[in-house]
Structure formats: C-alpha cells, structure tokens
Amino acid sequence: MAVYEEFMTHFDGYKIRNVMMFERMINECLHCGEQLLAYRDSQGRIRGYVRFRSRKDHVKVSECIYSGSTVLTKLLKAAVGNHTELRLEVSEAEHLEKVFPLAMSRKRIFTMVRCGNLPLFNKLYNANVRTSKDAYAIGFKPLYLNEKY
C-alpha cells in the first residue's frame, strides 16, 4: 500500500485503498486471466507493481504503480515478455516520452465532467470558476481518474 500512496501523491486525487481492496484486486486478477507482478528492492520492499493481460498480439497494462523510472522500466520489461507490443494508458503529466523516447503515443480523451452548481463549488473551494475546465485548472497536480476501483 505504501508504494501506491507514494505514487498517488503526484496526482490531484485518488481512491483510498486498503488491504481488503488489494486482496480483492488480486482475487480478480486470478479469476479474470490477468497477471500481477511486483518489483521489490534489495530490502524486500515493494517499489511498484503492474497489472496486465497477455493478448494474442500484445500485452495490455491496466494498472502500473511505480516509485521511479527504473522500477517502471523493469516492470514493463517483465510484463511484455516475448510480445512485441505493450499498451499502457497514462496521464500526460507522467511524461513517459522521457523514459521511452521511441514509444508511439496517442492522446485519448475519455473523461467528461459537469459542474452542477458553480456558485456552491466556488463557495466550497474559495474559487471563481466559470467552467469545468476552470475547476480542473485550480488544482496544481495532474488528474488521476481511475474509475475501476
């Protein structure tokens, strides 16, 4: 749980997870044909994990939590195995092009937000926003929008 909490400090919000949620995720992986790999440091502490599914022609990563670029690289290398393609969705703020300059990327927008009561929002957050985009802009961390857990 510590590596998850550390990773999430870089984002504007996240879902709080407890041990029971991680146990449920492990059980789901076992029953849905997914794999879960963890990377441990020399002291045996988990420094990252990757949840993925091997397909016929590629590996699809559904979640990757890591404490640094070295850990990320090792996790993805282990996940890709003998496949030639790995698919990973990340926020733009992670800047993976620095770690993987030759990786092909494409932008995909998939979150839509509507602020139902702007006066209430402004009062609660001591803000002066007029649109949902303005509301996102008042946060100084990149968005983390994982709606699965």
List each model region and its residues:
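Active-site/acyl-donor-binding loops of N-acyltransferases
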Residues: S62-Y149
